[in-house]
Amino acid sequence: MRTLSEVANKVKSLKDAARESDQRHRDVHDVRTGDIDTVIPGSMPDAWPRPVVANVIDTTARDTSEVMGQMPSINCTNSLQTSDRSKKFSSKRTKMANHYVISSRLPAGEQVKFCDHYLSFGLAVYSVEPDFERHTPILRVENPMGAYPEMDLFGRLKSYSRIWREEAVSLVAKYPQLIRVLKPQGSTGYDQDEGWAEREIEVCKYTDADQITMYLPAHSNTLIDSMPNPMGKLTISIAVRPSFDHEFRGAFDDAIWVYLAKSRMAMLGLEATEKAVRAPLAVPRDLQRMVFGGDSVLRTDNPDKIRYVGIDMPQFAAQEAQNMERELRLATRSPQSRSGNVDANIITGKGIEALQGGFDTVITTGQQVIGQALKRALEYAFEMDEKLWPNEKKTIRGVVQGAPFEENYTPSKDIGGNYLVDVAYGFAAGQDPARAIVAMLQLRGDNLVSRDFVMRQLPMEIDVVQMQTQIDNEQFEDALK
């Protein structure tokens, strides 16, 4: 095990090496939340502290992550199993894997959050942790901002560090021994006037195969807690968006600057319109008395010289706004058809298909990477369940493919060292369900693929063994009628 000093020095080195990546993450986060002034100070006037155009970065990230965040098919069976005993054993493990997913609330929005992190920051993290109240492993989606994974030459995770900020009162509630460090000398309580309870404290958690250590970097590396890793391995599964330079690059690192330019152009246009409405009034010299209001009478010998001072708008302003809109769509790889805006010139099947082509590849690539991360996380969950609660008899309940199930299992007996699980989005990943099903029916109709293959590639959650058994029973009952 490393000493606290060695851990602190290592985390500091990882943080220094990821300085540019951290800045990109902060910029994307601030743009999505509308804090433009923190990215480009002074760019927003006091009267309009927020952008006056739709936040295309945020809406695109939400739209893409909601499409990408559909749950894959999770199975522990394969088509080579022939005996009923092996099929029953694998079917039980399939229900266990789905129970882990349901208990982790992945179908209830956590998977969409994971995909959002993958798109926005180029890094998404599953942390497999034990829930000692329910006695089950949980796949927790962790915020990758401030996360520093260390990988070897082959892409395997060696250590994982994360730094975040938390209020002092929350830390003291979790770790009472920290009150001596965080509470100032002479302080008598938690009064707001003292202010220490609301201060945000920097916390670091370091994990590797040997140890789990938490400390306060800004308070002389004060140790919070440290323990040996009971699993003897990292139970962290990460999904890294492919990049050309091995950096964590999100999908919007470059697009935010186009959006900021578009927002600035819209603000200048709004300012020009306001100035045009409130333009000064030019009058001839012989006008002695100004009268304002409806049906006012102005006495002058030169009424044609009474006018508002106009502001000449550049002719290319509208064209530049359209160019920025087009560049922003290219940068985010999101077609206009996703928001319902389709140019009348391309309202054909081929036109819509061409617009969706780039979007489909984003979904397909993302689901392949995320599927592998979920597969590793479920394997860690099987191993954790067997190691921490080996002989405990458990009853699990859940819903798969719309059908509720209830199963009893003992980890040491029903897992038995077999942690393999298959996570598949299907060969038609990225397509809408209707097109995917039609393509598979065509392949099945020409006997190019087996029925088992088609069932495993369906864009929905399904227990292949249970479904096939149910189909066989229904066919047998129909034959007897």
Model regions and ranges:
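Intrinsically disordered, low-complexity, compositionally biased regions/tails
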Residues: 38, 46, 73, 150, ...
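Long, contiguous amphipathic alpha-helices that act as assembly "spine/axial" helices in icosahedral shell
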Residues: 30, 56-61, 69-79, 84-130, ...
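Intrinsically disordered, low-complexity regions of eukaryotic proteins
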Residues: 29-32, 37-39, 60, 65, ...
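C-terminal anchoring/interaction modules
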Residues: 1-16, 283-481
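Extended, helix-rich architectural segments
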Residues: 1-178, 182, 322
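A broad, low-specificity signal for short, low-complexity segments enriched in glycine/proline
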Residues: 84-90, 220, 289, 413-416
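N-terminal hydrophobic or amphipathic segments with adjacent small-residue motifs
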Residues: 63, 116, 149, 189, ...
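Structured, contiguous alpha/beta core segments that scaffold functional sites
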Residues: 3, 9, 19-22, 115-123, ...
